[in-house]
């Protein structure tokens, strides 16, 4: 992961509501994909980058494809890919057997929480300093 991307993403998890911690630091979101095949897409709501971790051992490999670059990555159990999901059109190919992956990402709109707690800064009804 690039240091500047890490710095941007980690500022979000450093100020989670109620001083909570993220189990997927420096990301704030986690998706569990079970037997998922996707159409070609970009993720416009993601912040900077996403990380994909393959956690199954399916027949053959998991093929992650990128339209703009023409790259087809044959991923196996334990492989990790980090890429800018807002900029690269991507999809995963059809497969046989079972396929499971974890996708780590952060929502780009989390920057509003960094700026002013989504408009709640100074509100007595929301204590961002206390743990629940």
Residue positions per predicted region:
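Conserved, ordered domain cores of eukaryotic regulatory proteins
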Residues: 1-46
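Catalytic core of Fe(II)/2-oxoglutarate
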Residues: 46-48, 57-132
């Amino acid at each position: 992961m690039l240091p500047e991307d890490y710095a941007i993403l980690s500022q979000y998890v450093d100020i989670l509501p109620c001083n909570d911690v993220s189990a997927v630091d420096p990301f704030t979101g986690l998706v569990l994909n079970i037997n998922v095949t996707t159409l070609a897409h970009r993720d416009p709501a993601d912040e900077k980058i996403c990380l994909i971790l393959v956690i199954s051992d399916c027949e053959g490999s998991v093929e992650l494809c990128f339209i703009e670059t023409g790259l087809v990555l044959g991923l196996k159990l334990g492989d990790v890919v980090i890429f800018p999901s807002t900029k690269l059109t991507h999809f995963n190919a059809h497969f046989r057997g079972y396929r499971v992956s974890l996708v780590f990402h952060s929502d780009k709109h989390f920057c509003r929480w960094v700026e002013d707690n989504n408009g709640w800064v100074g509100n007595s009804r929301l204590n961002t300093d206390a743990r629940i």
